[in-house]
């Protein structure tokens, strides 16, 4: 009878278990929810949006930090 040489690691067991249980597609949803939560609370330091400045007449775009407290 064939015997495995090394013990299977916990992380590999967990990955295989999650694939069997159908939990492999939850990761992107959790990341999206986490990003939305950090933006809504104002704690996001890595989310930027492009703002077009039409008041000056030029078509330049600025990269500014997204802030929900600014009206």
Curated annotation (Swiss-Prot):
GO cellular component, one term: large ribosomal subunit
Region spans: Disordered: 1-24
GO molecular function terms noted in the UniProt entry: structural constituent of ribosome
Any one GO BP annotation for this protein: translation
Domain of life the protein comes from: Eukaryota
Keyword entries, A-Z: Chloroplast, Plastid, Ribonucleoprotein, Ribosomal protein
InterPro entries hit by this protein: Ribosomal_bL32 (IPR002677), Ribosomal_bL32_plant/cyanobact (IPR044958)
UniProt family annotation: Belongs to the bacterial ribosomal protein bL32 family.
Protein's recorded name: Large ribosomal subunit protein bL32c
Organism: Pinus koraiensis (Korean pine)
Gene for this chain: rpl32
């Amino acid at each position: 009878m064939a015997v495995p040489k090394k013990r299977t690691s916990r992380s590999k067991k967990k990955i295989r278990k999650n694939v069997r249980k159908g939990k492999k597609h939850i990761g992107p949803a959790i990341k999206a929810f986490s990003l939305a939560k950090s933006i809504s609370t104002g704690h996001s330091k890595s989310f930027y949006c492009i703002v077009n400045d039409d008041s000056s007449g030029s078509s330049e775009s600025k990269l500014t930090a997204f802030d929900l407290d600014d009206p």
